[in-house]
């Protein structure tokens, strides 16, 4: 059974645990709820506190002295956000959760977009910039963010950045589309649904919703 397989008798603990660590995806459920315009999973202050902690403890401004026994997605003077950190005075399991020292791009984009959604714009953009600087076309291929292989799909979490900035929401049942952008004065955003895609633009107090391909059946615009 699981206990027999993962129990480490010598050290008296389960293997592959987070323990008292700070995990990059600790509020992942709230991220999904935010993107899908669902009810809150956690209190707002708890989510913001968690995202603050992820940036404070998991973001590494210089990889040169970062010890990583696993796969190397960042090195030397590069920056990145690690999977799980163990802040000072927090006990680290002898055998922690696998890949905890790595900087996986899909997780980094998820955390960064969530920071932006919850008002931590500068922190989120710093995390995104760290990824893109590693894949600048000189050191690595900018079109192939390697994780568990070439062209790994998890980096598509970067699409959530568009949703974070535009505040795009859609309710198919009510035929309602909405935009709650972090920039209120003027903006131009791309939107996409299963039936089509287009743009929304606000300029000089005028809002323009365009369908560039396919169709869009609406009853409400919020």
Per-segment meaning from a language model:
Residues 1-104, 136-137:
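Extended glycan-interaction surfaces of carbohydrate-active proteins
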